[in-house]
């Protein structure tokens, strides 16, 4: 959530910066609500002052034995008006809050201005795409003989679900273990196991609600007035970031660095017809997430560090990739600045997103009321960052495509062999005649 004081001081400036993000701020509606709020607050303060004055007058009159009934009646009338004003003020504050909850974060000044992914800016590349001396297959054709089973996944749960079997399932697990081990043993993160189902207020904290309810899978139990609504997490960023919700941490405890391997559940409501083949876009997929909670003056150094941590995974796996700075129109709702990592997929002859690392500054912290005690001992909002380290399914896709062999086998990257019992390659199971 944005700082409402920023809007009160520079409404037109905020509106312009939000327009760069593709969001049209209803300046007239905000101004009207603010004017009404100020008028009610001013009137309430006047009534409070008048009531205080009359209360003193009543005390003095009683001391003199004078009749106070008329003054008491006026005090009663003031009380009734104040109750009505408080109710109206509460209504206005709710409307302001609803308006604020729908506003995306303001982009950092270094973010390129643009409308969509076509305006993103490539920062750097690593690795050289492999040259194949045979016809390259995509991960579906490579993986299906090795244990990638889309047919059974669809039979069990519908489109965009996958079953993994045998060595492919083991490779998928090895990738997640390798990522977690790298982040905990080399990058200083604390491994965390989180709930996969969370309460609605948790999603308000990280910005998925109210705007993106259609992208979430909802879980309901009970019935009627006793219905309890919860949601499956779309990323463990949700659970990890909210660990500091409604708390004040000591400055000496920062940075807090957490990582988790979890399934993620997304309805992909706005993705109809996109990436329908294979594992690129699934309703259920695994991801290793990184989250950092830091002091404001350290957040952009932390963003660069986090990007480096995601890059390290790709480098250790020997997968070519590029780093892209997202433009204002392509960033996520809560982000102030985002870098995407895109891995090379030879069958598509292009780079595809495999990680997104974002600094949300105080946007999520303000929604969660997550603070730290600064050097002066005063509570101050933290900055929160999140990044994929990496999406496990898409990394599996990249390994299958980049490490495929002409005979249909897949070479196991050296970094994963300790997690695969020393296995150097995955061959299709022998066909039983």
Swiss-Prot record:
Coiled coil: none annotated. HAMAP family: Ser_tRNA_synth_type1. Pathway: Aminoacyl-tRNA biosynthesis; selenocysteinyl-tRNA(Sec) biosynthesis; L-seryl-tRNA(Sec) from L-serine and tRNA(Sec): step 1/1. It is an enzyme of class 6 (ligase). This is Serine--tRNA ligase. ATP binds at residues 266-268, 353-356. Catalyzes the attachment of serine to tRNA(Ser). Is also able to aminoacylate tRNA(Sec) with serine, to form the misacylated tRNA L-seryl-tRNA(Sec), which will be further converted into selenocysteinyl-tRNA(Sec). Belongs to the class-II aminoacyl-tRNA synthetase family. Type-1 seryl-tRNA synthetase subfamily. PROSITE patterns: AA_TRNA_LIGASE_II. Keywords: Aminoacyl-tRNA synthetase, ATP-binding, Cytoplasm, Ligase, Nucleotide-binding, Protein biosynthesis. It comes from Burkholderia ambifaria (strain ATCC BAA-244 / DSM 16087 / CCUG 44356 / LMG 19182 / AMMD) (Burkholderia cepacia (strain AMMD)). PANTHER family: SERINE--TRNA LIGASE, SERYL-TRNA SYNTHETASE. Its EC number is 6.1.1.11. InterPro entries: aa-tRNA-synt_IIb, aa-tRNA-synth_II, aa-tRNA-synth_II/BPL/LPL, Ser-tRNA-ligase_type_1, Ser-tRNA-synth_1_N, SerRS_1_N_sf, SerRS_core, tRNA-bd_arm. GO terms for molecular function: ATP binding; serine-tRNA ligase activity. GO terms for cellular component: cytoplasm. One of its GO terms (biological process) is selenocysteine biosynthetic process. It catalyses: tRNA(Ser) + L-serine + ATP = L-seryl-tRNA(Ser) + AMP + diphosphate + H(+); tRNA(Sec) + L-serine + ATP = L-seryl-tRNA(Sec) + AMP + diphosphate + H(+). The keyword rRNA-binding does not apply. It comes from the Bacteria. Its main location: cytoplasm. The lineage of its organism: Bacteria, Pseudomonadati, Pseudomonadota, Betaproteobacteria, Burkholderiales.
């Amino acid at each position: 959530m944005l700082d409402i004081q920023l809007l009160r001081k520079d409404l037109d400036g905020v509106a312009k910066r939000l327009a760069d993000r593709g969001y049209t701020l209803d300046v007239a509606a905000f101004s009207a609500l603010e004017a009404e709020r100020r008028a009610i607050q001013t009137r309430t303060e006047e009534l409070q002052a008048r009531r205080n004055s009359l209360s003193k007058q009543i005390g003095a009159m009683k001391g003199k034995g004078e009749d106070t009934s008329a003054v008491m009646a006026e005090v009663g009338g003031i009380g009734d008006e104040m109750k009505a004003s408080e109710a109206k003020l509460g209504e206005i504050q709710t409307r302001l809050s609803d308006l604020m909850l729908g506003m995306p974060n303001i982009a950092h000044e270094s973010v390129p201005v643009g409308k969509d992914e076509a305006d993103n800016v490539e920062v750097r590349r690593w690795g050289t795409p492999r040259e194949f001396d045979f016809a390259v297959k995509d991960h579906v054709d490579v993986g299906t003989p090795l244990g990638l089973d889309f047919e059974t996944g669809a039979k069990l749960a519908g489109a965009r679900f996958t079953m993994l079997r045998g060595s492919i399932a083991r490779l998928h697990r090895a990738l997640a273990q390798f990522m977690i081990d790298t982040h905990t043993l080399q990058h200083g993160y604390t491994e965390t196991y989180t709930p996969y189902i969370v309460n609605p207020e948790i999603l308000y904290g990280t910005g998925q609600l109210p705007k993106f309810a259609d992208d979430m899978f909802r879980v309901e139990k009970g019935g009627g007035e006793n219905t309890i609504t919860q949601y499956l997490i779309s990323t463990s960023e949700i659970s990890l970031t909210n660990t500091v919700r409604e708390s004040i941490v000591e400055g000496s405890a920062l940075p807090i660095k957490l990582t988790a391997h979890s399934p993620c559940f997304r309805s992909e409501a706005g993705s109809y017809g996109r990436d329908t083949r294979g594992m690129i876009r699934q309703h259920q997929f695994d991801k290793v997430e990184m989250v950092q909670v830091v002091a404001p003056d350290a957040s952009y150094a932390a963003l660069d560090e986090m990007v480096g941590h995601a890059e390290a995974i790709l480098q250790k796996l020997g997968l070519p990739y590029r780093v892209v700075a997202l433009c204002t129109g392509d960033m996520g709702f809560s982000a102030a600045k985002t870098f995407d990592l895109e891995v090379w997929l030879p069958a598509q002859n292009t780079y595809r997103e495999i990680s997104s690392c974002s600094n949300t500054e105080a946007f999520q912290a303000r929604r969660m009321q997550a603070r730290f005690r600064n050097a002066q001992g005063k509570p101050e909002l933290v900055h929160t960052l999140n990044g994929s380290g990496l999406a496990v399914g898409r990394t599996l896709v990249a390994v299958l495509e980049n490490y495929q062999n002409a005979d249909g086998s897949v070479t196991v990257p050296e970094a994963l062999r300790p997690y695969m019992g020393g296995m150097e390659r995955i061959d299709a199971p022998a066909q039983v005649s």
